[in-house]
From Swiss-Prot:
<comment type="function">
    <text>Catalyzes the addition and repair of the essential 3'-terminal CCA sequence in tRNAs without using a nucleic acid template. Adds these three nucleotides in the order of C, C, and A to the tRNA nucleotide-73, using CTP and ATP as substrates and producing inorganic pyrophosphate. tRNA 3'-terminal CCA addition is required both for tRNA processing and repair. Also involved in tRNA surveillance by mediating tandem CCA addition to generate a CCACCA at the 3' terminus of unstable tRNAs. While stable tRNAs receive only 3'-terminal CCA, unstable tRNAs are marked with CCACCA and rapidly degraded.</text>
</comment>
<feature type="binding site">
    <location>
        <position position="137"/>
    </location>
    <ligand>
        <name>ATP</name>
    </ligand>
</feature>
<comment type="similarity">
    <text>Belongs to the tRNA nucleotidyltransferase/poly(A) polymerase family. Bacterial CCA-adding enzyme type 1 subfamily.</text>
</comment>
<feature type="binding site">
    <location>
        <position position="137"/>
    </location>
    <ligand>
        <name>CTP</name>
    </ligand>
</feature>
<protein>
    <recommendedName>
        <fullName>Multifunctional CCA protein</fullName>
        <ecNumber>2.7.7.72</ecNumber>
        <ecNumber>3.1.3.-</ecNumber>
        <ecNumber>3.1.4.-</ecNumber>
    </recommendedName>
</protein>
<feature type="binding site">
    <location>
        <position position="23"/>
    </location>
    <ligand>
        <name>Mg(2+)</name>
    </ligand>
</feature>
<feature type="binding site">
    <location>
        <position position="11"/>
    </location>
    <ligand>
        <name>CTP</name>
    </ligand>
</feature>
<dbReference type="GO" id="GO:0016791">
    <property type="term" value="F:phosphatase activity"/>
</dbReference>
<keyword id="KW-0819">tRNA processing</keyword>
<dbReference type="GO" id="GO:0042245">
    <property type="term" value="P:RNA repair"/>
</dbReference>
<dbReference type="InterPro" id="IPR012006">
    <property type="entry name" value="CCA_bact"/>
</dbReference>
<feature type="binding site">
    <location>
        <position position="91"/>
    </location>
    <ligand>
        <name>ATP</name>
    </ligand>
</feature>
<dbReference type="Pfam" id="PF01743">
    <property type="entry name" value="PolyA_pol"/>
</dbReference>
<comment type="subunit">
    <text>Monomer. Can also form homodimers and oligomers.</text>
</comment>
<feature type="binding site">
    <location>
        <position position="21"/>
    </location>
    <ligand>
        <name>Mg(2+)</name>
    </ligand>
</feature>
<keyword id="KW-0511">Multifunctional enzyme</keyword>
<dbReference type="InterPro" id="IPR003607">
    <property type="entry name" value="HD/PDEase_dom"/>
</dbReference>
Amino acid sequence: MQVYLVGGAVRDYLLGHPYQEKDYVVVGATPEHMLAQGFQPVGKDFPVFLHPETKEEYALARTERKSGQGYHGFQFFTDTTVSLEDDLIRRDLTINAIAMDQDGKIYDPYGGQNDLENKILRHVSEAFAEDPLRVLRVARFAARYFPYGFQIAPETLQLMQTMADSGELDALTPERVWKETSRALMENHADIYFQTLRDCGALKHLFPEIDALFGVPQRPEYHPEVDCGIHTLMSLQQACKSNYSLDVRFAVLVHDLGKALTPAEELPRHIMHEERGIKPVTQLCERLRVPTQTKQLALSVCKEHLKCHQIMSLKPGTLWRLLQRLDVLRRPERVEAFVQACECDAKGRLGLEDRPYPQAQYMREAMQIVRSIKVQDLPENIKGAEIGEMLIQYRIEALAEFKNQHQSLSHS
């Protein structure tokens, strides 16, 4: 039997990029051969084995044939007669269809090295269209390799468009869409993922709430970029630039969904867009089965981001209630994530990417103030329900003093 390193590890090796995961293809072996050598079977749909020592994945060379809709609509065939070329042709992109043997020799039957050199993302064969998940994968690769100048081949983008128009994307399970999207959100240029999906017509099928933002105007004095969709992607790029968490990036992505629901006669103003956004954010999260923690932050940012922008003018009681809703006493990290998302919104505007956002520090200091006030700070004779009431009173008074000090400093 012959063993070949394949896929992303070979691609990144040839690009000179670091890689961690290694996947191998085994040609000329049977499941019995693998078991006899101590490999552990793990594949449900086709023979995949874990190496007895390294625990790296070894898959028997296979071919596949479309047998139904969606990601699981395939029949696989594996046999000792299946060649390396047979296995590689079923892969998505030419740059992922390169193999390397144990001596370091490269096998590239479909021109992947040439496409790497020319910075092109190109599908290997028309079988690409049989797996709708590949539309999302190519969009994710476009995001990952955007800084290096990679572009999608026109014929591949056209094929993605055809797939989007065919309705095949509807067969994707929510779990698969979220898994691919959450990975894409953690790329350094996650905005390119969504722009690519829009370019091929997939965004309106998978994320209609986000697609609806494009073409919706905003007031140019606040948003020089004008377009709501462009602002959303610029804000997301700010979150990527700061290397923020998945929760923050997703919250930034959906913070303005309510603007797509603004009545035409009110444009370019977006009065009450925070409240209008609650329903589409909730629908999107439920449809994709977004994790609860991610959904909670997204809803908080959607509902409250304008309050963060206006934080220095908030009354102490209003600020306390905002901090309470963010669970400041039990989850200070959630307040920090909220602030990060709001700052991305403020900076995701044409020409304003580097402007200061003093509201962030103000919010952080306010958080520390309310968290520093403990039961031990109250008079000893306070009992029962009065304890909670007085704690709130003390915290609001402390926020009032903080606001006065801040105003005095800013006017001095």
